[in-house]
Structure formats: structure tokens, C-alpha cells
């Protein structure tokens, strides 16, 4: 993607200082989602590396990963798999606990969400430390998926999440980087 388009995408993301706590700059993609041109360019850029290839499913992490992942799945003519917080899926699930900055959380996926060997792309809005994304990759692999790549609109490279996924042999595709937290 050309640098001007990437710059425009970055400009479409609102930065909110000291949210949710002092010292954190929250990267708010709702402004990008609300701009039809920016939203389309972001989805097109997330789809680009996989166009023409076989992607069976796109998995999105709750909640913004649902918005982006659904759009990516549509463009790739793939199915969509939601990865949700524990207790939100109605059928038989597989769950995983993962570490947060303060404490732990759990996410889950339907146990039959993919067929063994399905080629899956994981999508979310942002990668920071990589804890949530790593848990999602682990869940997908646990139910038999081949995780082809993980895609994010935003990377916070100082926090090392993308590197953590690459160490698991998961290629990472991001659109824009922001410094800091």
C-alpha cells in the first residue's frame, strides 16, 4: 500500500491520551470505521495479501475484530468465526485463559468452528503485547485450524506482540504503527 494511503489511515485513527488510565494513549478506530473511504481502504489492505489464495475462515476477536474480520471474510468469500469472551457462545466450546496486564481473562470458540486443516486468518484492530492474539492462535490451533496469518490495523511495536506471534510461526500483517502504549 502506498505511503500516502497508510498515512491517511493513520490520520483516521483518533488518539485519546490518558485513557483508560494515565500514561496510556488509546487508539480509537471508531473514527476510521465511521469514514467510509478509510474503512474500505483498511479492509482492502487487510485482504490484499490473501486475495486469490485459499482462506477457508476468518476469525475475529471480540469486539472490533468482529467488525473488521466480518468485512475481510466477505471480501475473501470466506466464513467468519467469532472468538468471544467466556460464556457468550451458545454451543459446545473450547476455552483458554490468558494473562492481562492486571489479572487473567478467558476467551472461547465453538469446538466445531473450523474443520481440521482449515486455513484461517486471524483479524483484530490492534496488537499490543500479543497476549490476546496468542491465546486466539492457540485456540484456533487446538480445534485444528492452520493459522495462515494474523492481521491488525494497528501495531504498537514497542510492546512486542507482533514479534511474539512471529515466534509462533504466524506471519503478521499490520497497516500502521504507533509509538508507545
Curated annotation (Swiss-Prot):
The keyword Cytoplasm applies. It is found in: Cytoplasm. The keyword Transit peptide does not apply. Pfam families: Pribosyltran. Keywords: Cytoplasm, Glycosyltransferase, Purine salvage, Transferase. PROSITE patterns: PUR_PYR_PR_TRANSFER. Its EC number is 2.4.2.7. One of its GO terms (biological process) is adenine salvage. Pathway: Purine metabolism; AMP biosynthesis via salvage pathway; AMP from adenine: step 1/1. InterPro entries: Ade_phspho_trans, PRibTrfase_dom, PRTase-like, UPRTase/APRTase. GO terms for cellular component: cytoplasm. It catalyses: AMP + diphosphate = 5-phospho-alpha-D-ribose 1-diphosphate + adenine. Its main location: cytoplasm. One of its GO terms (molecular function) is adenine phosphoribosyltransferase activity. Catalyzes a salvage reaction resulting in the formation of AMP, that is energically less costly than de novo synthesis. Belongs to the purine/pyrimidine phosphoribosyltransferase family. Homodimer. This is Adenine phosphoribosyltransferase.
Amino acid at each position: 500500500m502506498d505511503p500516502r494511503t497508510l498515512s491517511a489511515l493513520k490520520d483516521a485513527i483518533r488518539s485519546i491520551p490518558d485513557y483508560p488510565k494515565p500514561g496510556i494513549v488509546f487508539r480509537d478506530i471508531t473514527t476510521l470505521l465511521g469514514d467510509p473511504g478509510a474503512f474500505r481502504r483498511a479492509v482492502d489492505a487487510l485482504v490484499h495479501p490473501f486475495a486469490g489464495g485459499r482462506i477457508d475462515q476468518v476469525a475475529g476477536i471480540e469486539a472490533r475484530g468482529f467488525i473488521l474480520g466480518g468485512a475481510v471474510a466477505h471480501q475473501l468469500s470466506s466464513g467468519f468465526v467469532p472468538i468471544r469472551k467466556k460464556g457468550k457462545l451458545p454451543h459446545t466450546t473450547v476455552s483458554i485463559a490468558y494473562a492481562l496486564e492486571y489479572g487473567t481473562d478467558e476467551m472461547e470458540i465453538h469446538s466445531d468452528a473450523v474443520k481440521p486443516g482449515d486455513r484461517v486468518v486471524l483479524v483484530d484492530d490492534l496488537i499490543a503485547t500479543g497476549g490476546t492474539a496468542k491465546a486466539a492462535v492457540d485456540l484456533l490451533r487446538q480445534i485444528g485450524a492452520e493459522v495462515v496469518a494474523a492481521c491488525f490495523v494497528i501495531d504498537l511495536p514497542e510492546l512486542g506482540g507482533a514479534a511474539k506471534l512471529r515466534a509462533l510461526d504466524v506471519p503478521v500483517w499490520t497497516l500502521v504503527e504507533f509509538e508507545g502504549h
